[in-house]
Every structure is written in structure tokens, then in C-alpha cells.
Amino acid sequence: MKKEFIDVINKLANKGKELGFYHLNMENESFDGKHLTVKGKEYIYFSSCSYMGLETNEKMKLAAIDAVQRYGTQFSSSRTSISLTLYEELEDLLGKIYGKPTYLAPTTSLGHISIIPTIMDTRDAIIMDQQVHNSVKNAVQMVKGDGVYTEILKHNKIDYLETRIQILKQSYDRVWYMCDSVYSIFGDTAPFKDITPLLDRYEQFHLYVDDAHGMSWAGKHGRGYVLNQMPFHEHMIVTSSLAKGFGSCGGALIFNDEAQKELIRNCSSSSIFSGPLQPAVLGASIASAKIHLSNEIETMQDELFERMFYFVQTAANHNIPIINNEMTPIFYVAIGKPEVGQKLSLFLQNEGYFSNYMVFPTVPMKNSGMRITLTRHHSLQDIQKLLERVAYGFEKIMKEENYSMEELYEDFSMIDPSKSNKVEPVIRLKVA
């Protein structure tokens, strides 16, 4: 990254800190998953990625305490040497959730660093979606330096992806497409119904999916969005995060067979040299996995889907411009002009709501917006009141800034949602 760009990011970050948007500290003496206290003011928290609300689950808290009582605060050894039996128990449970061999990494980011440099070499070509998570891009940079061919695909342009596969397969043994299942800013999803046929059509085509934001709220046993949309393919690797919907910490690496899993266990640098997860985390994760393997997770999924559907309906009723209605727990209110976004964020904070104000360079300059995430901790009334304040503040500030909805739609290449959006009933496909 060039120094000039670093300087721009640093300047914007410092400005955001001055305005009270970033690098804040929660002052709560305890946390219920919904209420925050920052600088003496209480907020309803609408930027958590703990979609299922499991971080406050009593079973998980008691399991974490029990693990600490039994094993201490840390078992300080590389897993190459020796690890707690809790690891084996958790990986076995994760394997039952996914129906495939699963390896546990300290984080999803370290999981990418485990897989990509170990499995891929100069016989491979890598195509990254433009919006794939930065942790994937960082791992790809490691192999790019070793001569692995990489390129960027415009976001979700699957027709062009097929063209690139046809060309690259003539020169490379494997052509990888790397994408997120659910994209963390706009909440949109990868078009797996269009990607799946390519895996069967082209022998050299392989798929690498980061399903961090799809875990728990979607799929049988909460196995995630991607495996709720398509069956596991032999030319596929899936990674996920236990730090979001799952309610604990760690990265799940899901493979087609045991040989791939053992290759990562034996040869990846982060597997050999990284420290282990703490006993408390492993204990809580085991409790969460047992919840996922019970009927309880289906009830939790239904509760979250009710909130997601209500959000989409209510936003449409208030003519709030939402980037997509794909029924994920991540929603992006299109604002466009940074000055409008800054004022709206401050307005919502003053009203007692905490969400993420997204601005350049995280999003394009004229694509600023409010990222709002839903969890089971929120009530329908919480959502209704938030969106009422968003609608009121949005209209008021747009007028103050002399910024029209027509300009906003042009900046986002959108059609007026009041004329085009149609809220359909939620249908959850279940893939065994």
C-alpha cells in the first residue's frame, strides 16, 4: 500500500475519531448484547455481528467457566506438539455440523494464511471477487510474491468469470474463484446458483468461499449460507468464523476429505507456529456446537428471520433506500454524499442508536452509508423506532445539504426503491 494512501486513511480515521465514530470504548460494567454505554450515554447497539445473540447464552458462559476451572486460562503449546482434548471434541462436532472434515484455526484470517500458501502454487490461477474480504486478499498476496497468477473480477460478474475460466484453464491446472458468501458491508450474497454449474462444467475450476457472515443463521445445523445454497463440491473449500453468529472465537476450515485437512494440520505455517485457542473459548464453542446440532438453532433462526423480514418491510414503508433485500442480517442504507452520512450518523447517536457509518476508503467516495446489523437481541419495536428515526433524519438532512434522491440513486446506480422493490416472503432452502 502506497504511503500517500496510508496518509489519506490515517487522516480520515483521525477525523472519524474526533467526530466520535471510531475507536470507541464501551463503558458497560456488564453487557446484554443490546445496550452500550459510551462516554456516559446509553445506546441501542445495531452493529454487532453476533447475529444469533449467543455471546450471552448461559450454557456457553457456564461451559467457558467450567473449561477454565478444569484447564486454566491457557494451555500454552503449539498444536503440532500437543493440544487439549477439547480441540478434538470441538472439531468432531463441527464436522457433524458441516458434514465434512473440519479443522479449527485460531482465527479465520489465520485460516486463510494456513490454506492458500499451502495448497496453491504456480500451477494455479486465482481470481478474486472485487469485494472479497481483505483477509483473503492478504493471504493471496503471500502466494502472489511466489509467482502465483492473480486477478480481480468485478463484483459478482459471473458471466465474465466463465470467460476467464475458459481462457485460464488453457495455461493452469486449477483456476480458483475466491469470494465471500455474504459480503460484510452491503449484505449482498454471492450468486451460487450461477457458480455451481461452473464447477461441473469445468474440471479445472475450484471454489474458495469465506462464509464468515453466513454462519449459524442459515442452513441445516447453522452450517452457513453457502451450504444452504449448494451442496459441498469436491473442488471446493469453505472457511467460516466462530466469532460472529456462532458466539465464540476461531476459524472453521471445511474440506472435502481428510487428506486435505491433514495437509493443513501438518504443513501450514499458522498451524505449526500459532498459539492455541484458550480453554474458555473452546468450552464455549463446544456448547455452541451442541446448540447448533439441536432443534434450538432452528427456533433461533426463525426468530432472526422474523426480524430481518420486518426490517425490509418497515424500511420499504418509509422509503428508506436499502442496497439490497436479500434477507441477510446486514443492511446498508444508501446515503451517498459523505456530508449527509456524517450528519445522519451524529443524529442517530444523539437519538440513542449506535450503527456503523461507512465512508471512503471502505466504500467508494459517493457510496457512503449506514451499515445496520440485526441480532436476536433486538425487538421488533427496536427496529421500528430505529427506522422511524432514520427516515426522519434522512429527509431532514437531505434538504439541509441540498442533495436529492435522484442524485443519490445516480451515485449508487439504483432505481427508486419505492417504484421497484417488492418484498417477497422469505424462503429458506435447506440442503442436507
Model-inferred region functions:
Residues K2-Y71, F205:
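N-terminal "arm"/small-domain region of PLP-dependent enzymes with the aminotransferase-like
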Residues E298-F309, H318-E351, T362, K366, ...:
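Conserved PLP-binding catalytic core of the aspartate aminotransferase-like
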Residues L227-L263:
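Active-site PLP attachment segment
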Residues L62-T107:
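Conserved N-terminal alpha-helix of the aminotransferase class I/II PLP-enzyme fold
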Residues E151-Y208:
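Active-site phosphate-binding strand-loop segment of PLP-dependent enzymes
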Residues T118-N134:
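Conserved PLP-anchoring active-site segment centered on the Schiff-base-forming lysine
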Residues T73, T80-I82, E351-R371, M398-M405:
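Conserved PLP cofactor-binding pocket of PLP-dependent enzymes
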Residues P276-I297, E303, A315-A316:
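Structural motif of enzymes handling amino- and sulfur-group chemistry
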